[in-house]
Amino acid sequence: MNIAAKPPLTIRLCGPRGFCAGVDRAIQIVVLALKSYGAPVYVRHEIVHNRYVVEGLEAKGAVFVEELDEIPAEHRAQPVVFSAHGVPKSVPEDAASRNLFYLDATCPLVSKVHKQAMRHNRLGRHVVLIGHAGHPEVIGTMGQLPEGSVSLIETIEDADAYVPVDPDNLGYVTQTTLSVDDTAGVITRLHERFPNLTAPAADSICYATTNRQEVVKQAAPGCDLFIIVGAPNSSNSKRLVEVALRAGAKKSILVQRAAELDWDEIGAISTLGLSAGASAPEVIVNEIIEAFRARFDARVELAETVQETENFLVNRELRNIELTAADMAFVNG
């Protein structure tokens, strides 16, 4: 019996992809807290926007809540971790009022945006925050400042319609996970309308967001399909889907697990682009590759722009706890 040959497929695997230093740090904080203090360790909001990661931490003993009042009184001696997206100032204040011990896993680059916004405010500027309404990072940044001292701008249309009280006394910051190109367009329009608009001391969009978008731009032309591994509530992952389409991929989709792949819809392809959002673990990237290898004679080509070496330290309370490869195998493989 003749066995049909698998059709050839080139997979353009983007690098860098997947976890950034801030996500790595946040997950490590929860893992180390569990090793140090024992289960349960409470986490306010998803530590990062990825269900695979959340479920892996739940299996280790983490309990995810949306508000601090969900923590049972009998467990208030256990630590609570704040997510990588950052929280309003009111959250640690609430934790202190409840005598909760908390570990802040806010990404240091998000904390930098908080400081930039507070500096604008301290110098008397009204803060313009470029970001997506309702995103936890935006909620956290707006929550650093008094009510009414921040205006949220999402699009160029918002920038056109914006009417500030004092157009000569504005300073902007941005969410860290936005589209680099879209954000540049909004900033340009704001500068056109408000020439005295003050920029932050450093770019707010994080290195990892920029790097992942740049390599997707380079890899996308000529791809029949581009897959971004990530969750539907992951801002940076959704931006990568958009970047791939704009850069020339015929189709781009967001996938959480290989089981979601619709092979009838994928059809006959010869070139596949593959990357992962900053909160998507490498084990799922490998899972996707193996799913395609089962159906295609797949050859993987690495499309790499830069190598990332950034590393953020965990909280001081956890630095003497050993973190092993086995501790992180659930996400790293």
UniProtKB/Swiss-Prot annotation:
Binding site for isopentenyl diphosphate: H49, H85, H135, S234, S235, N236, S279
Positions bound to dimethylallyl diphosphate: H49, H85, H135, S234, S235, N236, S279
GO-annotated biological processes: dimethylallyl diphosphate biosynthetic process; isopentenyl diphosphate biosynthetic process, methylerythritol 4-phosphate pathway; terpenoid biosynthetic process
Matching Gene3D superfamilies: 3.40.50.11270, 4-hydroxy-3-methylbut-2-enyl diphosphate reductase, catalytic domain
UniProt GO MF annotations: 4 iron, 4 sulfur cluster binding; 4-hydroxy-3-methylbut-2-enyl diphosphate reductase activity; metal ion binding
Enzyme Commission number, as recorded: 1.17.7.4
Claim: 4Fe-4S is one of the keywords in the record: yes
Key words of the record: 4Fe-4S, Iron, Iron-sulfur, Isoprene biosynthesis, Metal-binding, Oxidoreductase
Cofactor: [4Fe-4S] cluster
Keyword Oxidoreductase: yes
Any Pfam family matching the protein: LYTB
Binding residue positions for (2E)-4-hydroxy-3-methylbut-2-enyl diphosphate: H49, H85, H135, T176, S234, S235, N236, S279
Catalysis performed (reactions): isopentenyl diphosphate + 2 oxidized [2Fe-2S]-[ferredoxin] + H2O = (2E)-4-hydroxy-3-methylbut-2-enyl diphosphate + 2 reduced [2Fe-2S]-[ferredoxin] + 2 H(+); dimethylallyl diphosphate + 2 oxidized [2Fe-2S]-[ferredoxin] + H2O = (2E)-4-hydroxy-3-methylbut-2-enyl diphosphate + 2 reduced [2Fe-2S]-[ferredoxin] + 2 H(+)
InterPro entries the UniProt entry points to: LytB/IspH
Pathway info: Isoprenoid biosynthesis; dimethylallyl diphosphate biosynthesis; dimethylallyl diphosphate from (2E)-4-hydroxy-3-methylbutenyl diphosphate: step 1/1; Isoprenoid biosynthesis; isopentenyl diphosphate biosynthesis via DXP pathway; isopentenyl diphosphate from 1-deoxy-D-xylulose 5-phosphate: step 6/6
Residues engaged in binding [4Fe-4S] cluster: C20, C107, C206
Biological role: Catalyzes the conversion of 1-hydroxy-2-methyl-2-(E)-butenyl 4-diphosphate (HMBPP) into a mixture of isopentenyl diphosphate (IPP) and dimethylallyl diphosphate (DMAPP). Acts in the terminal step of the DOXP/MEP pathway for isoprenoid precursor biosynthesis.
NCBIfam families tied to this protein: ispH_lytB, PRK01045.1-4
Family of this protein: Belongs to the IspH family.
Protein name: 4-hydroxy-3-methylbut-2-enyl diphosphate reductase
Species this chain originates from: Rhizobium johnstonii (strain DSM 114642 / LMG 32736 / 3841)
Gene this protein is translated from: ispH
